[in-house]
Amino acid sequence: MKYDTSELCDIYQEDVNVVEPLFSNFGGRASFGGQIITVKCFEDNGLLYDLLEQNGRGRVLVVDGGGSVRRALVDAELARLAVQNEWEGLVIYGAVHQVDDLEELDIGIQAMAAIPVGAAGEGIGESDVRVNFGGVTFFSGDHLYADNTGIILSEDPLDIE
């Protein structure tokens, strides 16, 4: 499904929170949306593998990487796992790498930057916790919509039709 965050903001202005414009699109989908699962991890993506092995249909993984752009939390292997398990998208408050491969995949990926250095894989972090970045607080179960213009968040699903 295609999402237009500008149109959604016009219609649902009182019902959405707008994430500050810190992110760029690195995935093969120009827009994506779904119910979110939150993760907090710093320069370590081991926990992301466990979560992305789950069925992701209709879901978006929101990763609070502390805003670090020193190590990439998502690479092509991890993104392929997300595609295989039907995740709608990933929002990374941090960095990604292997961007040429990422843009070929049928998934939305919004991140702050790209860097060639990968993350540790120790599995350090926590999931289903409140995370805050970009001027917005994210809770697992909220609904996120993203496109090349921006990212918006709503407690309830928005009627797109």
Swiss-Prot record:
GO biological process: negative regulation of RNA catabolic process
Subcellular location per the Swiss-Prot or TrEMBL entry: Cytoplasm
Assigned keywords, A-Z: Cytoplasm
GO molecular function (one): endoribonuclease inhibitor activity
CDD domains per record: RraA_family (cd16841)
Keyword Endoplasmic reticulum assigned: no
Pfam families in the cross-refs: RraA-like
Primary subcellular site in the record, as a coarse category: cytoplasm
One of the record's GO cellular component terms: cytosol
Presence of keyword Ion transport: no
Family: Belongs to the RraA family.
Oligomer status and interactors: Homotrimer. Binds to both RNA-binding sites in the C-terminal region of Rne and to RhlB.
NCBIfam families for this protein: NOT-MenG, PRK09372.1, RraA_entero
Free-text function comment from the UniProt entry: Globally modulates RNA abundance by binding to RNase E (Rne) and regulating its endonucleolytic activity. Can modulate Rne action in a substrate-dependent manner by altering the composition of the degradosome. Modulates RNA-binding and helicase activities of the degradosome.
Annotated protein name in UniProt: Regulator of ribonuclease activity A
Protein source organism: Shigella dysenteriae serotype 1 (strain Sd197)
Phylogenetic placement of the source organism: Bacteria, Pseudomonadati, Pseudomonadota, Gammaproteobacteria, Enterobacterales
